[in-house]
Amino acid sequence: MYAMKEKQAQAVSLFQRPLWVAIFALTAAVVWGWAYPLIKLGFKEFAITPDMTGSKMLFAGIRFCLSGLIILMVARAKRISFQVRKRSDSGFLLLYALFNTTFHYAFFYFGLSHSEGARAAILNTLSVFTVVILACLFFKSDRLTTRKVMGCLIGFLGILALNLGGEGVGSGFTWLGDGMIILNALSSAVASLMTRGVSQRVDVFVGTGYSLALGGLLLIVPGWLMGGTLPLITPLGLLYLVLLIGISTTGFTLYNKLLSCNPVGKVAIYNSLIPVIGALSSCLCLGETFYMKYLIAGALATWGIYLVNKGKG
């Protein structure tokens, strides 16, 4: 019993060491950045067109539900307790599943279908700076400092830089594309703030599995009721789906564990690197044009990371 507690303490301390926090947070950012082109490639391989709303929800639901089930099976194999501390906490976990998975990715998949992967990746950083600011209001471990404010402002300038110019995807704001990505970002921000509460109600690993499995199911059911199908199933399409499941499993497991034992803002700010990875991977895999404004926006977001992590608290 003592040895088990000692191992748990060591595991927690590993996720609190600055070097490992950076490594794990960067790993989550890299795998999430690659989700942008893989989703578009998956849609293409499964013959899901932009107007097939039900099919997109079904595709997303299958991805997250399977990811959540994998996490729960691993938790069971490791004999991690599934016990929720209070029955009343079930409502909180359901709400978390809605924001972390259902709302978050319903908006994300819709928006990505009407926006270039590189543009969506950078616009999605709105959630990062929202979390950094709001965390200072909700958690004592996150203090609002001049550096944090400057980091968020500079990062937000990256989003503004994305909308400059009239070339390619810089033609202006659209609700179906940009609007949905922004709503996705806000849902992600709310979920990030709720993660600390999840860790107080159930093991964070189990909570992550619950949120993905349940949230995925809440995407599958309405998607199916809306007539959603997977029109074409190919080996390559299944490979893309498996990769996306792996991305969800890895990204959420690492990110949520880090959020549960570190200042939220210090962890969330690393997601500013997602647009850089998303833009590069979209250009490499989809043949999208890499405009200079992507580079400028990515550089500003990276500068924001430095400022937030340089400060104390």
Language-model region placement:
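Small-residue-rich packing faces within the transmembrane alpha-helices of Major Facilitator Superfamily
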Residues: 33, 61, 65-69, 156, ...
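Hydrophobic/aromatic residues within transmembrane alpha-helices
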Residues: 42, 59, 111, 137-140, ...
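Hydrophobic transmembrane alpha-helices of multi-pass small-molecule transport proteins
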Residues: 1-2, 71, 133-134, 146-166, ...
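Specific transmembrane alpha-helical segments of multi-pass solute transporters/efflux pumps
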Residues: 35, 76-120, 124, 161, ...
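Transmembrane alpha-helices of multi-pass small-molecule transport proteins
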Residues: 2, 49-100, 130-134, 187-191, ...
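Juxtamembrane helix-entry segments on the extracytoplasmic side of multipass membrane proteins
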Residues: 17-22, 52-57, 85-90, 164-187, ...
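Helix-helix packing/entry segments at the starts of transmembrane helices
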Residues: 62, 101, 105, 119-126, ...
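Glycine-/small-residue-enriched transmembrane alpha-helix faces in small-molecule transporters
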Residues: 2-58, 98, 170-197, 217, ...
